[in-house]
Structures are given as structure tokens and as C-alpha cells.
Amino acid sequence: MTHKLFEPFDLKTLSLKNRIVMAPMTRCRAGADYVPTIFMAEYYAQRATAGLIITEGMPVSPKARGYLWTPGIYTPQQIAGWKKVTRAVHDASGAIFAQIWHVGRVSHQSLQPDGSAPEGPTDEQPEGASCFAYDENGAPGNVSTSHPRALDLDGISRVRGAFVQAARNACKAGMDGVEIHGANGYLFDEFLNSVVNTRSDAYGGSPENRCRFLLEVVDAVTDAIGIGRVGVRISPNGRFNAMPEDPEMEATFLYLSEELNRRNIAYLHINDQATFGMPAIPEGLIPKIRAVFQGPIILCGGYDAPRAHGDINEGIADLVAFGVPYIANPDLPARLENGWPLNNADRDAFYGGGKKGYTDYPVYQP
């Protein structure tokens, strides 16, 4: 019997060969000036076995960076580097979306233009948050985030414009679409959270106001590159990057999901952080989101094949994203379908470095 997980799926403008998604994962392997390397083209092409690849997060501007060696999408050289990636993926019969990203307050002055402060919804610093930047001795490593400054209305407009240009650049580089990163304690997630976002203007207060920034960006990006080419990632109840518990979480994400449904986005990608020891998405919230969002839903977080089969067969998910298993298993769909054992990921090689732990994982030999 063929499980739905391995069946083709029509994702708006794309026909996917299966319902398996390669989740976006930061690997910190860009070259000088945050330009994608030829090793990255090899890495993604190896994993074109997925129905859809979602790239690692691409900062939309120099201000959007929070980690060393994360490939950007705001210079001609970066666009040229990503063209090599998309060409390799398409040559391998794959489909690929670019995740476009602003880290918000999760950054350090050593990564910011002219040593300026990171930017977020307010000037409150996340207690205990860190990022991969330069320490006081100029050495790369995990450092505490710098004190942010609050985005004013001009800054919000500037960031919105950066996302639009990044989406255009991604399409110029050959991407099949973009995913707007609204999860994991980064900029848009910070605006969504009622404890973090204490603004008193049109971008703070009610769920409608706290969702406004993300929805404006979705609208602007959709206008720029077209309906059906824009996905959104969220992480309800997430705690990454020192995000606090939000008493208005459910109301916020149900409102957001309903508004995204009205916009006919390509998909809604929901990340559950429980697999990393964080609180899980509350039981019952995903079905509530499913009731108000009728488009394709990607679920991500600690999946194996049986659970993926179950959630797709029950209609909870349309597609399932795999993260760490895809790092170590470029042939993941075949391994899942045939019950073959999985390679173990080299966690010491997750961030930075060269080909080791990146493009040297073998495919299974029956």
C-alpha cells in the first residue's frame, strides 16, 4: 500500500513529488559577505528527494542578521550564489522555497552595520537569549544578545520593503517561492507575543494590532511575487530565544490563521518546539487552526514515519517537515518508505565548517 506521505501533492503553483518537506535549518556555511557557496548547492541538490525544500533562513538585509555565516538575499553576489543552488536543485527535479528572515532583537552589535543596536518591537532585551556572533576578543562564538532599539514607523516601513525586495531577489535567483519566517522568537514572533510586544501604537495591544506587521508583509510580498508563492511559518507557544509564555497565544494565532486563510497563501507551516525540550503546542490548537485555515498545512517537530502517516491520513497535516533527519539522510523519503535505518547526524558539525557533516552523508545501499 502506498502511504499518502509518499504521494504527489499540488501546492498551489507547484506539483510536489511527495508530501515530505525538508525543514529550514541554519547551517552557518556561507562564504565571505554572506554569499552562498558551491558546497551549499551540493547540499541542497542531494536533498532534492523532498517534495519541497525550504532553505535555511536568509536575512533580508544586513540589519536582519543574528548569526555569522548565514547566507543573505540582499546583494547581487548573494543572488548569484543562490542561482547555483536553485539550478542544482531543479536539475535534480526538486522544488525549493527561500525562507526570508529578520532575527529582530536576537542579534549582536558585532553583526550589525556600524555596530548599531539590533531592532525589535520594543527596547526590552530578551533575558538569557544568545546568538552566534563575535565576542569581545573578535572570536566567533555564542554571545549574549545586545540591547535592542524599538522599531519606529519608518523602521517598520523599511523592514517591510526589505522583505519585498528579498522576495523579488529570491525569485530572481530561481526560487519557486518564499516562506516568511514568523516563528521561533524572531522579529514577527516578537510582535505577535503580547508579553514581548508592549507597544501602544497600531502595532501593539490587540491581536489584530500585533498581527498587523506580519500581515502587511504578507500582503506586500504577495503583491510583489504573486499569490500561491508565499508561505508563512509560525510557532504557537514557542519559547526559543527567551520568548515568554503568552496568555493571549491561542486568540492571537487563531486570528492570524484566519487572516492568512483569507490571503490564500501557499501554505501555513507550524513548528512545534517540544522536540527540543520546550513546551508543546497545546492539545487541540492545531485542529482549531485547521478549522479556520483551509489551505495546505505543513507540520514540523519530532516526526517519524508512523506519526507523519497518521497526521496526514487524519487530515491534521497535508505535508510533514523533517529537520535533523534530513541533515544526515539525503535519501530520507526512500529510507522512510522502505523502513531502512537512518544515519545519525553529527551534531558537532551542525553549524559552520566545511563538507564534513554537511555533504558527506551516504545514501542507503540495500
For each predicted feature, which ranges?
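Flavin-dependent oxidoreductase catalytic cores
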Residues: M1-P366
